[in-house]
């Protein structure tokens, strides 16, 4: 791994065990994973959702894997009667302590937990059990890192983000997307399409929606009545993006 900018649409990113630097990797197995369950229609009446984190969904003192979740945890979830799992943020992220919410590579499934094919096998197995899979997708902000992330992509610190003073999130130590830019809208919408088509996720739970919708990011807001929700302090560009994504 060397300190070179990772392209914004890298679909596989790994960390060098010695240098700790993240680098893009070509993922082209001789036999790409083929889904056994070609089509899947989730049961939604009612939708019983089990929220989970791949790395923490086991009892051992280590980071869990896609395979371990598929082999050990999925059967227990099915046995308990759930028909949907919501996987907490798995887009590639440099800091594990962020639980996956400081994303650096938006098109890459975190290599901490295994390979892209192993994640596909997990989703395929869930569908075979009648379990829908929702992805906790992070489009509300991005990690500030410049080597691993988009913080200074192609030498432009504002290519994807608002300029100061709106560039940095006041509470999350991260960068805020500028939803008024066409390239940002296209980037994020194509990201949604990628996860649905490549991995066959059944839908999304959008993280940090309040932060996206309000200029205040919801900080210091009580939201006690309708006037608090519709007070004129909403970001119309963010509303437009979420409408398109939906």
Predicted regions and their residues:
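Short alpha-helical segments and helix-capping/turn motifs at coil-helix boundaries
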Residues: 35, 71-72, 244-245
């Amino acid at each position: 791994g060397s300190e070179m900018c990772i392209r914004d649409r890298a679909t596989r990113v790994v960390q060098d065990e010695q240098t700790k630097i993240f680098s893009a990797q070509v993922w082209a197995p001789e036999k790409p994973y083929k889904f056994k369950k070609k089509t899947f229609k989730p049961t939604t009446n009612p939708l019983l959702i089990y929220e989970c984190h791949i790395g923490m969904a086991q009892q051992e003192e280590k980071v869990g894997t896609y395979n371990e979740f598929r082999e050990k945890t999925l059967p227990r979830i099915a046995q308990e009667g759930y028909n949907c799992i919501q996987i907490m943020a798995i887009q590639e992220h440099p800091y594990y302590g962020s639980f996956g919410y400081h994303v650096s590579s938006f098109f890459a499934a975190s290599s901490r937990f295994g390979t892209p094919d192993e994640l596909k096998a997990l989703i395929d197995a869930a569908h075979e059990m009648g379990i829908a899979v929702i992805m906790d997708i992070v489009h509300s902000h991005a990690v500030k890192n410049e080597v691993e992330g988009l913080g200074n992509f192609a030498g432009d610190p504002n290519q994807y983000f608002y300029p100061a003073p709106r560039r940095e999130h006041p509470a999350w130590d991260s960068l805020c997307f500028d939803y008024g830019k066409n390239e940002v809208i296209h980037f994020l919408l194509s990201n949604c399409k990628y996860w649905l088509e490549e991995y066959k996720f059944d839908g999304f739970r959008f993280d940090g929606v309040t932060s996206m919708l309000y200029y205040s990011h919801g900080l210091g807001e009580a939201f006690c009545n309708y006037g608090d929700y519709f007070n004129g302090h909403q970001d119309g560009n963010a509303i437009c993006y979420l409408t398109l994504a939906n």
